[in-house]
Amino acid sequence: MMTCASSDDNESEKDKDSESFVEVDPTGRYGRYGELLGSGAVKKVYRAFDQEEGIEVAWNQVKLRCFSDDPAMTERLYSEVRLLKNLKNSNIITLYKVWRDERNNTLNFITEICTSGNLREYRKKHRHVSMRALKKWSKQILKGLDYLHTHDPCIIHRDLNCSNIFVNGNIGQVKIGDLGLAAIVGKNHLAHSILGTPEFMAPELYEENYTEMVDIYSYGMCVLELVSLEIPYSECDSVAKIYKRVSKGLKPEALNKVNDPEAKAFIEKCIAQPRARPSAAELLCDPFFDGILDDDDEDGENNDNNGAGRIVVS
């Protein structure tokens, strides 16, 4: 004799097929899975889901106990991340929501998720890439930096490196991420605290008195890594040795492995002394990018062409 499954049995079967959330945000819109996408000194990034839009997102979680000795820093961190929510640029990871979890003492923020992971791993996976492709990626990073640096107030990333740049490989799109610890500075564009990844840190950053030009230096190191497939200063086996070489003005050995003279000259411009470094806007006009168009450039060109020959009546 055949028995019919109860509705409870059907529901339990459905539950087995669905992936349960580890936690949800206070509004119930975003659910976090247990899958860890990446982690750093103070932050972990998990795969999550936006139930309203039906899209996957990234759930970033900062442990505030890392700043327990400095309550002012905690509040500043929170206010800065909230401000970043207002950034709108195709080469900057979009920030959707920010909140503080008092019970677990964490700062949480939801960002868009990129399909192909970070640029460092993506480049390792695709070792045989044309210089044209590398230039397209580099130009997009620079456009994101230009947006940050010309924002009012100016935003200095301070930790730009290839692991903080993310890729949508299906469309060749590159986005700057990990902006949660960026510095938001006033009219003088001066910042004073030390943050960053040693291999990518400009010399003046160690001196705790710097401007957005530290990002240009880091950007140059990113381009060097993309071209050479080597992390800058990998010849050093300690942070102290990196600092010693950087403070003496010694360039990373990877620079000597760059065979393309145009690429080498471009990188050297980026990692020059602070006053000699071009701005992001100036670098975008560099001959290094001649003939390199990305989607935004092509859209603009198409719009110009579409407007050609039209008569505008006022």
From Swiss-Prot:
GO molecular function (one): protein serine/threonine kinase activity
Catalytic reaction(s) noted: L-seryl-[protein] + ATP = O-phospho-L-seryl-[protein] + ADP + H(+); L-threonyl-[protein] + ATP = O-phospho-L-threonyl-[protein] + ADP + H(+)
The protein's Enzyme Commission number: 2.7.11.1
Family: Belongs to the protein kinase superfamily. Ser/Thr protein kinase family. WNK subfamily.
Function description: May regulate flowering time by modulating the photoperiod pathway.
Top EC class of this enzyme: transferase
UniProt KW keywords: ATP-binding, Kinase, Nucleotide-binding, Serine/threonine-protein kinase, Transferase
Location of region: Disordered: 1-22, 295-314
Protein name: Probable serine/threonine-protein kinase WNK11
Active site: 178 (proton acceptor)
Pfam families per the UniProt record, alphabetical: Pkinase
InterPro entries tied to this protein: Kinase-like_dom_sf, Prot_kinase_dom, WNK_Ser-Thr_kinase
Domain Protein kinase: from-to ranges: 31-289
Gene (name only): WNK11
Entry superkingdom: Eukaryota
Binding, ATP: 111-114
